[in-house]
Structures are given as C-alpha cells and as structure tokens.
Amino acid sequence: MEFGLSWVFLVAILKGVQCEVQLVESGGGLVQPGGSLRLSCAASGFTFSSYWMHWVRQAPGKGLVWVSRINSDGSSTSYADSVKGRFTISRDNAKNTLYLQMNSLRAEDTAVYYCAR
C-alpha cells in the first residue's frame, strides 16, 4: 500500500513538472504589405538548447501550417516554400529565446503564429 501511494505521488510530481513548460510569443503587430516584423518566443521549464524548435501559423478559419524549424544549436534551418527567402528563423540559447524575422510580408502571411517544441 505504501508503494502504491509513493508511485501516485511520483506521477503527480512528474505531471507538475511537465506543466511548467512555457512558450510565450511576442512581437506581432499590424504592418503594411512589404513590411517587416520580428517575432520572439521566450521558453522556460525545459532545456531549451536541447530541442529543435518550430514556428507554425494559423490563418483565420484555417488549420495549423508549419512555417520553419531550427535545430538545437542553430546550425540547421528549413522553411516552408511559401516563406523561403523572406523569413529567417534563429535562436539564442543563452537567452532561451526563439526568433522569426519576417520580411516582405504579404496579405497571405496574416495569421496567428506559434512557436512549438
């Protein structure tokens, strides 16, 4: 019986740790077509430098669409064809922050942008 209680307690602790993962996006705004924006994503609750990170977006009334990814040390990136040459993903592992520089913005880039682990 004592073992069972200990096991349940351990599971509760692990679930609590998992819930501490936070990804907080900032930097959005309204710009004219052709303008630029830089998005940031502040990460906490996990070892940021150990994970590949992604940006995805959701246009109004549409599903989630993958935009870009970067490997753990920032040496490798890839992009959806729709943003290639216009968007640049980067990261600062010392600051636990992911970035998306968006240039030459188009009407079709209008969306809610999310970072993802």
Curated annotation (Swiss-Prot):
Region span, Framework-2: 53-69
Complementarity-determining-1: annotated segments: 45-52
Subcellular location: Secreted; Cell membrane
Signal peptide annotation: 1-19
Disulfide bonds: C41-C115
Entry's Gene Ontology molecular function annotations: antigen binding
Domain Ig-like: 20-117
Swiss-Prot/TrEMBL keywords: Adaptive immunity, Cell membrane, Disulfide bond, Immunity, Immunoglobulin, Immunoglobulin domain, Membrane, Secreted, Signal
Any one of the GO CC terms: plasma membrane
Main subcellular location of this protein, as a coarse class: secreted
Subunit-structure text: Immunoglobulins are composed of two identical heavy chains and two identical light chains; disulfide-linked.
Protein name (record): Immunoglobulin heavy variable 3-74
Organism from which the protein derives: Homo sapiens (Human)
